[in-house]
């Protein structure tokens, strides 16, 4: 074949994969069903912060608006961990978010870590499972809350259950940003 892999090599790869799948399937069938007690295993621990402490408006600090606070938090995360990515609808360098809240992040972190996605909410939310499985820390944005509905299936069925269903092997570490209430309404679809 043009990329240097011939049919016999592909057949060998397929045979190895098929054997692995069959072996894993047999192993899974032999496992016991989950018990009621296992429902509390492989869940994320609650935060140690159980009550608000400290000053919300320190005297030595200038007031900030919510969008700036979110930008500062994302920047802080991305500076502290190279595995953090920001992606979603119009968050890349050209626009930087519909409210321009991420305008400087693409310049600071580059197009490999801050980038646009297609207008497909289910993909944006669902892709965080795969990104997390390979060790990345996705921060994703759906353009407006009006458009979140296709992504909710992924949030409810994949993101929220991944850690439990994989017995802690694929904990999904993600942040989902969904702006709401700024102005106007978009209806159920773009």
Predicted regions mapped to residue ranges:
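Terminal amphipathic helices with adjacent charged low-complexity linkers/tails
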Residues: 15-58
């Amino acid at each position: 074949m043009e990329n240097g892999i011939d049919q016999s090599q592909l057949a060998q790869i397929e045979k190895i994969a098929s054997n692995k799948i069959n072996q894993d399937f047999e192993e899974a069938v032999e496992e016991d069903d989950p018990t009621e007690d296992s429902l509390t295993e492989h869940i994320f621990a609650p935060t140690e912060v159980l009550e608000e402490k400290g000053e919300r408006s320190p005297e030595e600090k200038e007031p900030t608006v919510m969008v700036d606070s979110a930008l500062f938090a994302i920047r802080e995360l991305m500076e502290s961990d190279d595995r953090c990515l920001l992606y979603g609808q119009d968050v890349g360098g050209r626009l930087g978010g519909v409210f321009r809240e991420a305008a400087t992040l693409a310049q600071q972190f580059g197009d490999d870590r801050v980038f646009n996605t297609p207008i497909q909410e289910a993909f944006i939310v669902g892709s965080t499972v795969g990104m997390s499985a390979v060790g990345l820390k996705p921060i994703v944005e759906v353009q407006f809350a009006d458009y979140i509905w296709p992504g909710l299936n992924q949030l409810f069925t994949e993101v929220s259950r991944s850690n439990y269903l994989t017995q802690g092997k694929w904990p999904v570490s993600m942040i989902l940003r969904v702006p709401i209430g700024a102005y106007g309404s978009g209806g159920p679809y773009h």
